[in-house]
């Protein structure tokens, strides 16, 4: 089945251009046409005072949005004379002052507009709405402006997380936005002294930036949010399907390096960063564009330069930083692999077994920003008999989720369809993820479950040196799964520690080739033909690789006893064992009757 084997060149992506882009002026916002168009429309239509943006909400991201708005909309505009000026008159020191208000006449007035656009890294009632201070041992009053006063007539940028943590701030802010009036809230002492502060007109626009989860939570507290606000998304990933898009993203990368770190990138570094970020997006045509994330990578790579005067980042420097990041985070991964290598968790990578196969899982721990793949032994036992069922042991013991259960049912339906079995199965089977003590979910093991079920029914051994991942439908077609890079590398790591023998490998869905961005050790092993990757489009191809037999009869092929198709072999086994069971049943009935006589 060499036609189904992947060549080493296909295991990691590279850009199609061979020279660095000449134009390195692309910015983050050049990669966000939907977002910038939405902001244009929001400002032009003036229908809603609020714009909700799905995006990263770190302060650096809010600041980046602030800078974009300033440069794009207010670059040539001085701050308008907008707002008010509060005047205090206090003829008698024993009385509270009389406070009068007039329109601001200059930007120096105490409640005049200070900014066109402003974001906040910290929110409190005082920082947002200002405060009224009564000086100690005195009846003097001081008014401190808040953010909303400083940006009166402009745009305020806040994160959804900030508002969720103090939702009462949002309720007051929404009231101000709707009424376009700001009323001072006085403490009890000042209220008793009948200190009156005139309310002021306040018109501003608000941008709320938040993650999808935070915005969903926000909407639960404010169900009519999207009746009050426009909505747009800051794309976390950029399309790079064609060469022009690739060069645009590479130009953006070079621009970040030059402006943020005063360094340069060579083509090898751009390709290595592309490979790194493809692992996150799991799509060679989608790549992360987060400035914060990319700058972190560039800073880390720059720390591995040979001398302090070297300001060109290459692939080797990026790779060193990547390996250092993995080393910092992979302690739990190494502990897991040690358990397998010490046979505390039994995973066989050599020989053959009937009804046993190595599936592949992605392991994630809460609070750990790192996931990894590891093999999982899936076993199957069958018993021939009418009215049988396939028992998912993990699901029955509430150790598997609904999607896993769905995958198991699809595997059963697929097998019944291939074998043309009656609705009442002529056999019983039990499938289990061996030595699995935590909850599992997902349908990426459904191809492996079908294969192990076929092995048990046909009584043919499966090679333990080949692991399998893939989801199937009822017709046996193999579909995409996630985490394919981690899964391949996890099985490879175990095989490598035990010694590569040139026969080990992984079967993956053909449709996930676009996800592949494997580490250099796997690529080198595939290049040396010490490790293999097979791509399959349907279950029949996977079973041909594993069992060296066709799943069903092929019209142009001659069959003998040693190469009979699997469906014939399974039906023959079921028939023979059913006859044997029937004969045994008759014998036991005769024996029972003799004893009674």
Q: For each predicted feature, which ranges?
A:
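Short regulatory helix/loop adjacent to the ATP-binding pocket of P-loop NTPases
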Residues: 214-228, 519-525
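The structured alpha-helical core of multi-pass membrane proteins
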Residues: 380-382
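Conserved ASCE/P-loop NTPase catalytic core
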Residues: 1-219, 232-242, 251-267, 271-376, ...
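Peripheral, non-AAA+ core regions of ATP-driven protein-machinery
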Residues: 1-20, 37-42, 145, 160-167, ...
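Conserved P-loop NTPase motor cores
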Residues: 212, 229, 234-238, 436, ...
């Amino acid at each position: 089945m060499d036609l189904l084997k992947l060549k080493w060149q296909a295991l990691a992506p590279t850009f199609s251009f061979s020279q660095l882009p000449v134009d390195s002026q692309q910015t983050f916002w050049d990669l966000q046409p939907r977002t910038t168009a939405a902001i244009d429309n929001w400002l032009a239509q003036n229908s809603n005072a609020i714009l909700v943006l799905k995006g990263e909400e770190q302060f650096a991201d809010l600041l980046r949005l602030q800078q974009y708005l300033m440069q794009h909309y207010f670059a040539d505009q001085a701050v308008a004379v907008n707002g008010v000026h509060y005047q205090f008159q206090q003829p008698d020191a024993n009385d509270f002052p009389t406070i009068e208000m007039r329109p601001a006449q200059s930007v120096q007035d105490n409640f005049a507009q200070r900014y066109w656009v402003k974001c906040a890294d910290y929110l409190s009632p005082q920082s947002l709405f200002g405060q009224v201070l009564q000086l100690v041992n005195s009846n003097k009053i001081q008014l401190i402006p808040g953010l909303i006063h400083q940006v009166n007539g402009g745009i305020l940028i806040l994160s959804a997380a900030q508002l969720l943590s103090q939702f009462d701030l949002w309720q007051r802010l929404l009231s101000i936005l709707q009424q376009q009036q700001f009323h001072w809230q006085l403490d009890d002492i000042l209220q008793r002294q009948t200190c009156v502060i005139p309310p002021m007109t306040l018109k501003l626009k608000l941008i709320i930036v938040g993650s999808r989860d935070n915005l969903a939570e926000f909407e639960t507290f404010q169900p009519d949010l999207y009746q009050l606000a426009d909505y747009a998304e800051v794309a976390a990933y950029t399309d790079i399907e064609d060469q022009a898009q690739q060069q645009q993203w590479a130009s953006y990368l070079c621009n970040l390096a030059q402006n943020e770190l005063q360094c340069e990138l060579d083509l090898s570094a751009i390709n290595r960063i592309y490979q790194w970020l493809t692992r996150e997006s799991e799509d060679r045509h989608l790549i992360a564009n987060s400035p914060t994330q990319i700058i972190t990578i560039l800073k880390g790579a720059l720390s591995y330069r040979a001398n302090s005067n070297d300001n060109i980042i290459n692939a080797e420097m990026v790779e060193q930083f990547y390996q250092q990041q993995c080393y910092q985070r992979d302690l739990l991964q190494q502990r897991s692999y040690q358990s397998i290598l010490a046979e505390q968790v039994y995973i066989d990578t050599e020989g053959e077994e009937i009804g046993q196969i190595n599936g592949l899982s992605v392991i994630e721990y809460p609070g750990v920003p790192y996931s990894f793949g590891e093999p999982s032994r899936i076993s199957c036992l069958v018993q021939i008999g009418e009215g049988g069922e396939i028992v998912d042991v993990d699901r029955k013991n509430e150790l598997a989720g609904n999607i896993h259960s769905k995958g198991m049912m699809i595997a059963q339906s697929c097998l019944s369809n291939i074998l043309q079995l009656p609705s009442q199965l002529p056999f019983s089977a039990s499938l289990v993820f061996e030595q699995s003590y935590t909850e599992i979910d997902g349908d990426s093991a459904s191809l492996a479950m079908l294969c192990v079920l076929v092995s048990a029914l046909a009584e043919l051994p499966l090679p333990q040196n080949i692991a399998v991942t893939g989801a199937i439908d009822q017709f046996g077609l193999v579909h995409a799964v996630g985490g394919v890079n981690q899964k391949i590398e996890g099985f490879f790591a175990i095989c490598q520690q035990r010694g590569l023998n040139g026969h080990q490998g992984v079967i993956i869905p053909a449709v996930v080739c676009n996800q592949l961005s494997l580490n250099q050790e796997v690529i080198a092993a595939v290049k040396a033909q010490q490790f293999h990757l097979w791509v399959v489009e349907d279950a029949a191809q996977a079973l041909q690789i594993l069992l060296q037999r066709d799943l069903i009869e092929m019209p142009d092929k001659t069959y003998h006893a040693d190469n009979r198709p699997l469906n014939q072999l399974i039906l023959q086994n079921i028939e023979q064992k059913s006859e044997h069971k029937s004969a045994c049943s008759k014998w036991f009935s005769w024996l029972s009757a003799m004893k009674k006589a």
